Amino acid sequence: MCGIFGIYSYERLNVAKKIYYGLFALQHRGQEGAGIATSDGKNIHYYKNIGLVTDVFKNETLQNLFGYIGIGHVRYSTTGGKAVENCQPFVVKSSFGNIAIAHNGDLVNSDELRRELEMKGHIFTSSTDSEVIAQLLVRELLKTSDKIEAIKNTLKKLVGAYSLLIMFNDSLIAVRDPWGFKPLCIGRDESNIYISSEDCALTTLDAEFVKDIEPGEIIEIKDGEIISHKLDYGVSEYNPVNVDVPCIYRGAATCMFEYVYFARPDSTIDGISVYKVRKRIGKILAKEHPVDADVVSPIPDSGVTFALGFSEESGIPYYEGLIKNRYVGRTFILPSQNERELAVRLKLSPVKSVLEGKRVVLVDDSIVRGTTSRRIVNMVRKAGAKEVHLRIGCPKIISPCYYGIDMATKKELIASNKTEEEIGKAIGVDSIGYLSLEGLVKAIGRKDLCLACVTGKYPTEVNFEKILGRE
């Protein structure tokens, strides 16, 4: 999962500083690296490096990124390591001059596409599938003078998740894959048109939300105009669960984890408030897994809104039993287990006056490996909690994700081979309760969702050898 942000200034103003602010608003989507590319109409200028947005970009760097068109990226690695070569945007040479590409998502057929390109003589500078997309586009641009046709022909080869920003010298193009895995939206103000992974970044820049880019839609921005194109092929219907809620986009499979964990609570995805979804999840969770307790406490920050809903529905008072160190990043998206475990100790501190002698309900968004949860429960018990109950605002994660979320291998997923009782014992809680699949879908309010990680049913074909390799 990454964050992408683009601007086209129809008043020909430099956009690098605004992209910086947009990426800062999307920092929760990736903390390993950041990059910005801009175009002044003739040349593309770019800079990228490892680190947070505030670490990568200083005023001098931004001042050297001239241009009225620009794209930016914050990186969270799922394919490729931490090296600066894997940071984005990627800038490649084409028959139209240099082009820059920023990508959010993962392809399931990237290995095959990479091998085909290497056999044709392409040399890759990174290990990411984003560069594969860039090189495919370069080849298609040799065959036609129509940029949109070349992009469509490139997209026909891709299977998986891709929200893309593609910048030519004179235009900005945004793409959302036919499944709509990752969010992407458009905003504008009196001087600029914006493209963003989440609308919270539009709010930061005081821009007006225009629309969500639809699955299978290509948005072309040129000469200050927004032109919509649609892919001329569809995808198979994907309905892994029968729940009486509407579809927003027929055939879509938007990642449910955006609503549960990744997106900022103040964002709205495809017309649905993330905050309201999480509040509803907490209320449904309290109905599905009631418990006698004295305190409801979130595991911050992602558990906060769930815990508020749980408290409201159950009548159990809400307290902050764990305090977060705001200078430590999100533990789930750190790339190694050692880093995650150290981050937990640095990140959270128990409030003894809240927890001591109390029956405590801890509420969190999900359990992936279980190691973080076990450490937190141990921390709460050491603070004097009499009982510790865990409630999870997501069904059990039983299968890996191949679309851009680092959910490890199947054997590392604690729920893939354990019952709820066994998980509770392994983590050290008095009871554990997961949100049901039906409860999740009802809380989100749409059924055109990717639920592969909690059902094992994937919306696209996935190479079986790749699955075995990851297991």
Swiss-Prot record:
GO terms for molecular function: 4 iron, 4 sulfur cluster binding; amidophosphoribosyltransferase activity; magnesium ion binding. Binds 1 Mg(2+) ion per subunit. Binds 1 [4Fe-4S] cluster per subunit. InterPro entries: GATase_2_dom, Ntn_hydrolases_N, PRibTrfase_dom, PRTase-like, PurF, PurF_N. [4Fe-4S] cluster binds at C255, C401, C450, C453. Keywords: 4Fe-4S, Glutamine amidotransferase, Glycosyltransferase, Iron, Iron-sulfur, Magnesium, Metal-binding, Purine biosynthesis, Transferase. Its cofactor is Mg(2+); [4Fe-4S] cluster. GO terms for biological process: 'de novo' IMP biosynthetic process; purine nucleobase biosynthetic process; purine nucleotide biosynthetic process. The keyword Transferase applies. Catalyzes the formation of phosphoribosylamine from phosphoribosylpyrophosphate (PRPP) and glutamine. PANTHER family: AMIDOPHOSPHORIBOSYLTRANSFERASE. In the C-terminal section; belongs to the purine/pyrimidine phosphoribosyltransferase family. This is Amidophosphoribosyltransferase. It comes from Methanocaldococcus jannaschii (strain ATCC 43067 / DSM 2661 / JAL-1 / JCM 10045 / NBRC 100440) (Methanococcus jannaschii).
